[in-house]
């Protein structure tokens, strides 16, 4: 072992070490399963070490507790040993619970006999009455086993047992007796058990817990010494019987003995363990003053060496050393006297001289050598007289006696005549054995029914009516309207069951009896042609041949009673029918009563829960009772209970089986239709020992028989059982009754009930409460056609099945005729097509009018001969012609992948691996070439190519398989389809590379794996013995974005592995026929399809997008989206596909992948406007007078402010006076001279924005239209000159972002899912408003604009002006460098009014739909906003503001795209939308065409700015639902801090618009600002600093008479807060507020400060 360990330690390659660890882990996992069988308990570490010393393992992860789990593990281990020793035949078990057969691994078919007897009271709970004998009995078998009860017997009892059991040869017995008790020593294994010595006996205490303790007499220990037991006969002379005993195993205090008839040899000495203890000599007198206990030899030697190692030993030193060497657990086994005696012993030994004082033999002369013997004799005599020397005394004190637990066997003699033992009463057990034998004979001898015989019987049943009792016997019972319980019959039933030892009654209620069966026979029901498959269970009906039963137009197949079923029913009473049901996982049946007409009203119903668990609910007049049924439980509903109770079943476990017994008094309704199950068909060409896997076939494709999506789903649909519902089930061609042969579609008989009738749940025991629906006329017609066809089957199908070479498809095509089938190009593969779930009898054509083959690229490949993989998987693959073949794996492809991983060119997870691992991977890929058994499965999406593998993965053991998936979507799909498989069996491809592998590796959709990955994985993972690749070569393959990666130059993996695929499944179960044929794929799903295309999105539909950018953005919005290429694994009834500029860039494979996802509905979402002839319409723009139609403007109701509310009186306050000279000093002090702040132009000089010498006035830049320098600097900064073509090109490229902006805007503003219909009346009203607003201007203003009304004025021309203004924003107050100004664009007046109408129209709709938590400062006043703030704003945390940079010029083509999508969603006429786009792309000034941007003179400027701000905010940030938000143009504020969406990092480079977030703490002096106002808990107040500074500017300009009133009204809102201002404003803001109040008073505006809140400003 040291050599092996050293060799392993010398291995430094991490991959090899990982492989070794994986193999070790697999072995550990297997061993832990074995350990769990014997020891399932959580064992303390010390006890676990003791168990491992005894050869019993412990699971360190177990959490199951037991008071003496370690001793239980020893007991289970001995049971396992006994199980290996017992013969594979019937054995008698004495004093053993039947459940312990599991530990012995005894098969129930051995039919072991249990003879138990109540020796102690606790035995009553151990053994049920079913196998308890009243006295000792003889043993009828050759071998017997006694479990832990031998100590209750003596040697005479054993002899008596052998004498009365002539068949008994061998008796195994376990006994629990600690051998150390014979010496009154403490426990040898104190961590496992302890021993007390009291009351002239000893007590064995497992685990130190008294609950499991046993008291023993010392005489019981004699069993440990027994070697032979001799019986001398009645006369006590000659030995007539000898029993030889031998101990086979000893584990702690548990021992296994074998007693054999005959005089055989047995070891003379019986060893119970190694000798490790010694007894110290008694060196003191009297004798009781010595240490009389045994101590470990190791401890004795340590104490001796210590006592002799120090110079002068003291008694204290010895005591201290003893305490040091002894563990705490050992100290509790010694008394104080014992410790003192031991210390004295070693103190004396330590004091004696250890130097040998006797003569030496070295260097003696001849004389001395001759006289040495005489001298020694004299010395010995002298020491006997005078005493020994010190060294001699020491040697005598060290004569330790070894304490051994080995014992010599003894011979025991017994005489006299033993009493006779009766024969055991095992009638009940023999009855169970007979049931089992009958079942075995029934199942093993069952004859396979051929298809011809089965269908012939079905045809006869369809013509012959079932035989029923004569009408004379059908006497209707007397109706009992009160539905009372038959008390007399119920008492008789309870009495009968109480006397039956085979059942226990646990609950006796007024309407029911609930109990448990003493013994549940081992049995099973095999699904065959007698099985009726319902929606969530399989059913069998047992009864006399003359009886028939059914419900809801369904008739069950009547089967004669199985003997074991009848015997179970006889336990509970007299019954003539039984309904057996096996349920699926989670199956349930609603409340119902067994009150059909075929039963009497006082019928007794007994339900037995044989296997699995379920919940049984009983609803009575007094309430509802619920029981959790486990195997063996039963419930009997008393006579009359069906009239006053209802019962239900739920929470069934997988394969939960029940038997329901009833007495059927009269026939069922004659309208029942018998369900024909045409399964159980032998396939002559595909014979295998393994069960044939057959995929589930699709529903019928007949238009007449197919259940439509809107039709109700039947509750109970009788179909063929899972074993029978396979691809080999015959299929009937249903022909219309009129003989027409149009659209002859396949109808599977197994699916016929599902598509023709509606049923309700079956019985548990009987019916549901709903009434059955009458058969429709169409259903009757279908049944007539079916029955007529079935009657002809015996003559038409006999020849078809006579040949061994014919396959199932021969019968399927019989109705069409052999010529039609042989004419199919793929008729040779028709059997294979059938096994895949397709009929293959249709000719379908693709878009190019070429015939579509269901199977393509069929080839024959050599089969691999060396496959180290599970045989069941290999056989399953062989059944569908997918046998593995040897595939060589390219070293070139593997080395390219390894090099990229090593040099960090690809991957995410592998980049985090250490350098050594990456280098090792690259080395393995470069050096190793592999040939591996591989199966390549190609098939279209939805073809079921992975279905076989998923079934096998769900059933195989853990550790056998690893499934590698390329995408998370595909990983979820596998997890959903294999819910019982451990999740660690499914891995993404990078995780699979760094984690453990398995013997079988499945790579699904392998075309999406990186090129070279498969080869590298095979090179790295030596554990892989079989590789299965599934994929579709027509779908998208992996795309490597890094051009420097070597794998980017490799061909797709499908190009290499296609030649190792036996055939390609070019058929699908997913898509409707129309969709599939459009893709060139065969499909038999005849469904109506829907294809739509529009510029709006369907809500709730899965969305496929061409780019990762858009996918991430949509996911951040909470919409499920996938890329075209990344949607593999998605199957959905409907899907929407986004079309944008990236769509034409996608390959054919990518588009095929996207288009094959939906079943029958596809919606194309076009994100850009349709390219039609819009430009010519713009040339017909009329003159201003012509488009101003004098229509009467709709009178809009004037806004009436709400009645002013009386606010709580706020106490008046007084602000201390502030220093006016220092109020703006923080802004004035940093100012520099005028020219250092002004803008400079080389030709025009400096601008003139800094006015006067007053430092306060210099804080405000004055921008003037006549300032040429500022004008040209503004054009340079704000205007970008381009060409119309460039604008159009930029617009077309921006569609990828515009739709994202709109979808976020739509979600934020709660717009409806579908486009908003155009309202002409609303448009006319908005148009009138715009016209009236324009005509309300002064005449001079209209005259000045006459040029722009001229028809010769270019509609695309813009007159550009510089806006004159004082810049008063607080953030720009006292700026050290003057910034460019703002432009005013004057468009043609017709254009302004047209798009002003469009903006106003969308504003009206926006106002009506705007959510309450969003406020837009448009057509509102501060009072309204203040009230809204108090109701909606959250001041408990931080707030958020957006500060945009160059907001107008940043609204480029992306924002234009957003505006157009928004306009189309509002159903604005196309010509108006196209004109707006043309204007934005062709607008020009005197310098040329300007780039797409926002201009201040446009009609929709404010509304467009506001909506762009909303769209930007919600695209960039996660905005909490219901968060209060304020918007006005480029100003915005939110009542919560916003976190940026991860998708925005992909969108941000495409957007010109930039912003900086401002976070406010919303505390005193730091509240959010909006349009110069502060958002405070008391409402909206004007910023005191900005208000005061602008007042000083107005005061300097001497225009106070015009503005003083407005300043007073703005100040009034804050002034009326009075003392509350202290809670809101900073000290500086309070100073500015106080100074402004003083100014208002000085200018006689103080009276305005006290106006009420609802005052309307004029």
UniProtKB/Swiss-Prot annotation:
Membrane keyword on record: no
GO molecular function, one term: metal ion binding
Catalytic reactions on record: RNA(n) + a ribonucleoside 5'-triphosphate = RNA(n+1) + diphosphate; ATP + H2O = ADP + phosphate + H(+)
Chain residues that bind 2-oxoglutarate: 656
Cofactor note: Binds 1 Fe(2+) ion per subunit.
Alphabetical UniProt keywords: ATP-binding, Dioxygenase, Helicase, Hydrolase, Iron, Metal-binding, Multifunctional enzyme, Nucleotide-binding, Nucleotidyltransferase, Oxidoreductase, RNA-directed RNA polymerase, Transferase, Viral RNA replication
Domain (+)RNA virus helicase C-terminal: 1066-1199
Example GO biological process: RNA processing
Residues at which Fe cation binds: 592, 594, 647
Family: Belongs to the potexvirus/carlavirus RNA replication protein family.
Name by which UniProt lists this protein: RNA replication protein
């Amino acid at each position: 072992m040291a050599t092996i360990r050293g060799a392993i330690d010398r291995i430094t390659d991490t991959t090899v070490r990982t492989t070794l660890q994986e193999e070790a882990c697999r072995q550990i996992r297997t061993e832990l399963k074995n350990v769990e069988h014997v020891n399932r308990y959580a064992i303390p570490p010390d006890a676990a070490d003791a168990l491992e010393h005894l050869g019993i393992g412990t699971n360190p992860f177990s959490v199951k507790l037991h008071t003496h789990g370690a001793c239980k593990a020893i007991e289970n281990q001995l049971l396992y040993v006994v199980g290996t020793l017992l013969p594979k035949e019937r054995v008698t078990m004495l004093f053993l619970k039947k459940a312990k057969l599991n530990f012995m691994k005894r098969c129930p078919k051995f039919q072991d006999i249990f003879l138990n007897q109540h020796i102690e009271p606790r035995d009553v709970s151990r053994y049920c009455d079913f196998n308890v004998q009243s006295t000792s009995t003889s043993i009828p078998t050759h071998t017997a086993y006694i479990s832990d009860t031998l100590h209750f017997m003596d040697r005479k009892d054993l002899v008596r047992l052998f004498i009365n059991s002539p068949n008994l040869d061998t008796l195994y017995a376990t006994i629990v007796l600690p051998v150390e008790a014979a010496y009154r020593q403490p426990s040898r294994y104190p961590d496992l058990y302890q021993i007390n010595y009291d009351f002239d006996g000893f007590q064995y205490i497992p685990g130190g817990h008294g609950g499991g303790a046993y008291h023993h007499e010392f005489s019981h220990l004699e069993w440990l010494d027994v070697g032979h037991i001799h019986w001398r006969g009645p006369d006590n002379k000659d030995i007539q019987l000898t029993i030889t005993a031998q101990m086979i195993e000893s584990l702690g205090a548990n021992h296994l003995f074998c007693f054999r008839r005959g005089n055989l040899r047995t070891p003379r000495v019986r060893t119970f363990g190694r000798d490790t203890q010694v007894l110290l000599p008694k060196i003191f007198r009297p004798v009781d003053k010595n240490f009389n206990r045994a101590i470990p030899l190791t401890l004795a030697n340590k104490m001796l060496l210590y006592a002799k190692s120090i110079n002068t030993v003291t008694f204290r030193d010895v005591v201290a050393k003893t305490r040091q060497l002894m563990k705490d657990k050992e100290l509790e086994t010694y008394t104080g006297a014992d410790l003192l005696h031991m210390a004295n012993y070693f103190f004396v030994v330590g004091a004696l001289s250890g130097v040998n004082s006797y003569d030496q033999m070295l260097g003696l002369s001849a004389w001395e050598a001759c006289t040495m013997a005489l001298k020694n004799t004299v010395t010995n005599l002298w020491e006997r007289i005078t005493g020994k020397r010190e060294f001699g005394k020491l040697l005598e004190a060290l004569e330790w006696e070894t304490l051994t637990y080995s014992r010599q066997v003894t011979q025991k003699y017994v005489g006299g005549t033993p009493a006779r033992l009766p024969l055991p009463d095992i009638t009940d057990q023999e009855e169970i054995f007979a049931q089992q034998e009958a079942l075995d004979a029934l199942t093993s001898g069952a004859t396979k029914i051929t298809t011809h015989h089965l269908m012939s019987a079905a045809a006869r049943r369809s013509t012959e009516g079932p035989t029923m009792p004569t009408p004379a016997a059908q006497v209707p019972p007397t109706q009992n309207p009160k539905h009372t319980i038959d008390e007399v019959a119920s008492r008789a039933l309870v009495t009968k069951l109480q006397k039956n030892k085979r059942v226990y009654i646990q609950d006796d209620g007024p309407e029911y009896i609930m109990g448990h069966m003493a013994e549940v026979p081992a049995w099973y029901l095999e699904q065959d042609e007698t099985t009726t498959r319902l929606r969530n269970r399989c059913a069998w009906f047992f009864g006399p041949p003359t009886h028939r039963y059914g419900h809801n137009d369904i008739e069950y197949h009547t089967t004669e009673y199985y003997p074991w079923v009848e015997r179970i029913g006889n336990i509970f009473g007299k019954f003539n029918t039984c309904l057996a049901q096996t349920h699926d996982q989670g199956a349930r049946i609603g409340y119902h009563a067994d009150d059909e007409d075929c039963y009497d009203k006082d019928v007794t119903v007994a339900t037995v829960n044989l296997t699995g668990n379920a919940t049984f609910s009983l609803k009575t007049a007094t309430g509802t009772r619920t029981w959790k049924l486990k195997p063996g439980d039963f419930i009997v509903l008393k006579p009359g209970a069906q009239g006053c109770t209802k019962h239900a079943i739920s929470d069934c476990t997988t394969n939960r089986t029940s038997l329901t017994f009833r007495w059927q008094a009269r026939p069922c309704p004659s309208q029942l239709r018998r369900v024909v199950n045409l399964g159980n068909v032998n396939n002559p060409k595909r014979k295998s020992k393994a069960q044939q896997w057959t995929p589930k076939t699709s529903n019928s494709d007949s238009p007449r028989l197919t259940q439509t999506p809107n039709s109700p789903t039947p509750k109970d649909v009788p179909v063929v059982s899972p074993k029978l519902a396979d691809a080999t089930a015959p299929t009937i061609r249903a022909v219309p009754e009129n003989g027409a042969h149009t659209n002859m579609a396949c109808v599977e008989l197994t699916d016929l009930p599902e598509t023709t009738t509606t049923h309700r749940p079956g019985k548990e025991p009987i019916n549901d409460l709903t009434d059955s629906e009458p058969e429709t006329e169409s259903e009757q017609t279908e049944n007539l056609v079916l029955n007529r066809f079935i009657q002809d089957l015996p003559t038409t199908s006999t020849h078809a099945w006579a040949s061994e070479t014919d396959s199932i498809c021969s019968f399927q095509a019989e109705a069409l005729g052999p010529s039609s089938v042989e004419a199919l190009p793929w008729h040779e593969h028709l059997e294979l097509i059938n096994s895949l779930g397709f009929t293959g009898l249709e000719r379908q054509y693709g878009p190019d009018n070429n015939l579509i083959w269901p199977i393509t690229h069929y080839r024959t490949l050599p089969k691999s001969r060396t496959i180290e993989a599970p045989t069941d998987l290999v056989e399953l693959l062989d059944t569908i012609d997918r046998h593995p073949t040897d595939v060589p794996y390219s070293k070139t492809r593997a080395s390219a992948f390894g090099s990229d991983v090593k040099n960090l060119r690809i991957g995410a997870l592998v980049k985090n691996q250490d350098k050594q691992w990456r280098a090792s991977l690259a080395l393995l890929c470069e050096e190793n070439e592999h040939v591996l058994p591989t199966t390549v499965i190609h098939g279209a999406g939805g073809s079921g190519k992975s279905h076989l593998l998923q079934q096998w993965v769900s059933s195989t053991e853990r550790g056998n398989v690893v499934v590698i998936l390329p995408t998370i979507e595909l990983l979820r799909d596998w997890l959903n389809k294999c819910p019982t498989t451990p999740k660690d069996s499914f891995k993404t491809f990078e995780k699979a590379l760094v984690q453990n592998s398995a013997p079988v590796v499945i790579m699904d959709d392998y075309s999406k794996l990186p090129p070279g990955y498969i080869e590298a994985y095979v090179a790295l993972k030596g554990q892989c013995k079989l590789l299965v690749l599934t994929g579709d070569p027509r779908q998208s393959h992996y795309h490597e974005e890094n051009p420097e990666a070597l794998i980017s130059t490799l061909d797709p993996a499908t190009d290499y592995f296609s030649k190792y695929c036996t055939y390609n499944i070019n058929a699908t179960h997913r898509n409707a026929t129309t969709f599939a044929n459009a893709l060139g794929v065969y499909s038999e799903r005849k469904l109506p399809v829907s294809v739509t295309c529009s510029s709006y999105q369907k809500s709730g539909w899965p969305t496929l997008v061409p780019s990762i950018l858009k996918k991430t953005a949509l996911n951040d919005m909470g919409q499920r989206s996938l890329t075209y290429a990344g949607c593999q694994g998605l199957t959905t009834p409907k899907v929407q596909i986004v079309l944008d500029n990236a769509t034409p860039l996608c390959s054919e494979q990518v588009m095929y992948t996207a288009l094959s996802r939906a079943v029958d509905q596809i919606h194309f979402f076009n994100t850009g406007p349709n390219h039609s002839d819009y430009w010519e319409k713009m040339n017909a723009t009329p003159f201003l007078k012509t488009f101003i139609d004098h229509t009467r403007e709709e009178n809009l109701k004037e806004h009436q402010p709400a009645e002013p509310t009386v606010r709580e009186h706020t106490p008046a306050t007084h602000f201390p006076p502030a220093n006016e000279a220092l109020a703006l000093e923080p802004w004035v002090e940093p100012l520099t001279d005028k020219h250092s702040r002004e803008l400079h132009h080389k030709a025009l000089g400096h601008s003139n924005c800094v006015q006067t010498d007053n430092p306060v006035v210099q804080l405000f830049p004055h921008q003037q239209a006549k300032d040429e320098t500022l004008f040209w600097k503004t054009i340079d900064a704000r205007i970008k000159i381009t060409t119309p073509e460039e604008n159009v090109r930029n617009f077309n490229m921006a569609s990828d972002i515009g739709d994202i902006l709109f979808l976020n805007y739509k979600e934020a503003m709660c717009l409806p899912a579908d486009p908003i219909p155009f309202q002409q009346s609303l448009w006319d009203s908005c148009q009138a408003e715009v016209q009236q607003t324009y005509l309300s201007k002064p005449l001079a203003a209209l005259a000045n604009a006459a040029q722009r009304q001229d028809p010769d004025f270019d509609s695309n021309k813009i007159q550009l002006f510089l806006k004159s203004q004082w810049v008063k924003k607080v953030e720009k107050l006292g700026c050290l460098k003057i910034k460019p100004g703002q432009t005013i664009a004057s468009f043609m007046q017709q254009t302004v009014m047209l798009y002003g109408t469009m903006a106003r129209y969308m504003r009206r709709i926006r106002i009506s739909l705007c959510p309450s938590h969003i406020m837009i400062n448009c057509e509102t006043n501060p009072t309204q906003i203040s009230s809204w703030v108090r109701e909606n704003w959250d001041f408990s945390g931080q707030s958020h503001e957006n500060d945009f940079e160059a907001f107008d010029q940043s609204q480029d083509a992306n924002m234009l795209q957003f505006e157009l999508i928004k306009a189309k969603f509002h159903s604005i006429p196309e010509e108006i939308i196209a004109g707006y786009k043309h204007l934005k792309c062709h607008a020009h000034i005197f310098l040329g065409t300007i780039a797409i941007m926002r201009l201040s003179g446009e009609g929709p400027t404010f509304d467009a700015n506001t909506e762009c701000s909303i769209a930007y905010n919600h695209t960039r940030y996660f905005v909490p639902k219901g968060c209060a938000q304020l918007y006005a143009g480029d100003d915005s504020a939110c009542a919560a801090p916003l976190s940026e969406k991860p998708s925005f990092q992909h969108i941000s480079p495409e957007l010109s618009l930039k912003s900086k977030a401002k976070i406010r703490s919303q505390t005193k002096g730091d509240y959010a600002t909006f349009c110069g106002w502060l958002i405070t808990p008391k409402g909206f107040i004007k910023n005191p600093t900005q208000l005061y500074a602008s007042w000083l500017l107005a005061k300097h300009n001497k225009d106070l008479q015009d503005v003083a009133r407005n300043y007073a009204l703005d100040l009034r809102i804050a002034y009326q807060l009075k003392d509350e201002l202290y809670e809101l404003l900073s000290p500086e803001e309070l100073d500015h507020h106080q100074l402004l109040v003083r100014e208002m008073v000085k200018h006689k505006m103080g009276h305005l400060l006290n106006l009420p809140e609802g005052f309307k400003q004029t």
